[in-house]
């Protein structure tokens, strides 16, 4: 359903922006759950625009395409991972660029500026769990959250920045998986993540159960419901535990992708 909505919308925006006099047919072979914290909306929209511009021989950066199709107004993560893959850190927006706190789909701002991009350890296993949650925060509800609870207190923003720059990133570069997981857990206790958990505490028991089962640290992606953790051979039993907690069909083990989009001709 998300593809049926977002592909025509992104195609229409792209065609109108460039004045293209042509029609396009899109065939989607596989996708992943919408509104689940995967950033699928941005990937679908930017990929649609990219296929059109590539076909028409138009050279343009994905950051510009994101703006054209109305994505990336909150975070640049989806745009930069589309191009580069890996671990992305962006710097937010200036008040001139984005005077109001709004989610990506409701903001006309360009994707935030890229601060850093690193290779994510490809030997680390990534566990993704999608618990059954009836309520997804999206659309007008998401806008209401941003307008009601933002800005996040400066002290908490400073805490988040310290955890990322002085803990999460260094531990990742040092391939210290256990302390990287610890940093992920600490990030759940401050800033926007803390707000998310206070507004919807349904995820907390599942996250605690995963941690109790041996996860090095469990995080929530965007507004959820997707939860994630990293693991190695020392705690690989976390996979079986996760399947027992949320259901075997709700768990996926994967690796990092340290490259961007691929166009096959």
Tell me the role of every PLM-derived stretch:
Residues 1-40, 50-63, 67, 73, ...:
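ATP-binding N-lobe of GHMP and related small-molecule kinases
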Residues 19-20, 211-212, 219-223:
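A structural signal for short secondary-structure junctions
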Residues 61-216, 232-265:
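ATP-dependent small-molecule kinase catalytic core of the GHMP/sugar-kinase superfamily
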Residues 47:
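Active-site signature of alpha/beta-hydrolase-fold catalytic machinery across serine-
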Residues 24-28, 218, 251:
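Generic structural signal for residues in well-ordered beta-strands
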Residues 26-28, 129-131, 227:
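A structural signal for short, well-ordered beta-strand segments
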Residues 203, 220-228:
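Small/polar glycine-rich anion-binding or flexible loop at a beta-alpha turn
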């Amino acid at each position: 359903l998300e593809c049926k909505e977002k592909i025509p919308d992104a195609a229409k925006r792209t065609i109108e922006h460039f004045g293209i006099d042509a029609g396009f047919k899109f065939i989607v072979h596989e996708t992943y759950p919408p509104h689940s914290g995967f950033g699928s909306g941005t990937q679908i929209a930017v990929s649609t625009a990219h296929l059109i511009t590539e076909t028409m021989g138009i050279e343009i950066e994905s950051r510009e395409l994101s703006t054209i199709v109305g994505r990336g107004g909150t975070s640049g993560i989806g745009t930069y991972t589309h191009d580069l893959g890996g671990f992305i850190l962006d710097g937010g927006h200036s008040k001139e660029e984005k005077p109001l706190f709004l989610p990506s789909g409701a903001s006309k701002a360009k994707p935030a500026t890229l601060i850093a991009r690193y290779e994510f350890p490809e030997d680390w296993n990534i566990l993704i769990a999608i618990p059954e949650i009836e309520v997804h925060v999206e659309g007008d509800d998401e806008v209401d959250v941003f307008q009601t609870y933002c800005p996040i207190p400066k002290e908490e923003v400073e805490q988040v920045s310290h955890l990322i720059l002085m803990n999460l990133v260094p531990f990742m570069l040092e391939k210290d998986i256990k302390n990287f997981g610890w940093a992920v857990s600490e990030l759940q206790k401050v800033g926007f993540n803390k707000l998310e958990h206070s507004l919807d505490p349904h995820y907390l028991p599942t996250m605690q159960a995963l941690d109790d089962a041996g996860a090095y640290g469990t995080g929530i992606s965007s507004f959820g419901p997707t939860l994630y953790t990293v693991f190695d051979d020392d705690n690989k039993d976390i996979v079986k535990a996760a399947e027992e907690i949320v259901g075997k069909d709700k768990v996926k083990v994967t690796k990092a992708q340290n490259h961007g989009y691929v166009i096959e001709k």
